[in-house]
Amino acid sequence: MRNSLTIGTRASKLALVQTHMIRDALQAAHPGLTVAVERITTRGDIILDRPLNAIGDKGLFVVEIEEAMRAGRVDLAVHSAKDLPSTLPPDMTLAVCPRRADPRDALVAQPGMTLASLPHGARVGTSSLRRACQLRALRPDLTLLDLRGNVDTRLRKLREGQYDAIVLAAAGLKRLGLEEVITELLEPDVLIPAVGQGIIGVEARAGDDEVLRLLAPLDDPAARAAITAERAFLARIGGGCRVPVGALALLEGDELLLYGMIGALDGRMVRGMRSGSASDPAGLGSALAEELLDAGGQALLAG
């Protein structure tokens, strides 16, 4: 068994915090294992002057790290699972999903402010079509503005007055020790999260049995079932950065509850929930996707 690994990751503060969590878990599971970290700049990190949906939706924060794995520079990659495309290349696999953190979206605004109490016409920043669609449905009076950059940059823009509020993933804020800036946690019946939100996705080369064996102790069955259902939902719809799609799976005993939404940019959307056995999460995800497509989602996707 090898005694060293190199992790590839983006260079943002959040990406490094998540990478160090995986590094520490690996070293706890395998005393004596040396784990190095290589920072890699992705296309999504470079292009900051355009909305994500205007750049493209196939692995904006992933492709360059996968290339480093193919070249043998790194052995595995640590991602926010919500950044992964709906289908991975055949030579890559989602090797590990550790225990999920808070999957909810978070509103960051003036202290005490909630989504319902934001003033008429308030400027709300988000880079997500999924969030924008659901916010338009809830509060059509809001002025939704694109928001790019890392978490620190987004919070700085809010402090400077460029926005009245912004919406970010709660998990990222909590991992960065910034929970105190959250003014409201948005429950899934208000905003359905992104597929994989709150999960760290560890990607490795398919067939790299030695690396996969080292990673195996880090996998969490509940997180694995949830992301399998959510990604099956996303894959059936064909969604990416260009389509407002959200899903959240919750494990209750042997049953998996899956919430999903398909939307349009103007705030029209279809939402639904389906339950099924946790032993077939992919089947549950595909079934809910079919249900929502038939209920009007297909027409929304067609424009």
Swiss-Prot record:
Top-level EC class: transferase
GO molecular-function term, one example from the UniProt record: hydroxymethylbilane synthase activity
Keyword tags: Chlorophyll biosynthesis, Porphyrin biosynthesis, Transferase
Residues bearing the modification S-(dipyrrolylmethanemethyl)cysteine: C241
NCBIfam families named among the record's database cross-references: hemC
Free-text comment on the cofactor: Binds 1 dipyrromethane group covalently.
Pathway entry: Porphyrin-containing compound metabolism; protoporphyrin-IX biosynthesis; coproporphyrinogen-III from 5-aminolevulinate: step 2/4; Porphyrin-containing compound metabolism; chlorophyll biosynthesis
Family: Belongs to the HMBS family.
Gene expressing this chain: hemC
Function description: Tetrapolymerization of the monopyrrole PBG into the hydroxymethylbilane pre-uroporphyrinogen in several discrete steps.
GO BP terms, alphabetized: chlorophyll biosynthetic process; protoporphyrinogen IX biosynthetic process
Further remark: The porphobilinogen subunits are added to the dipyrromethane group.
Pfam families: Porphobil_deam, Porphobil_deamC
Protein name: Porphobilinogen deaminase
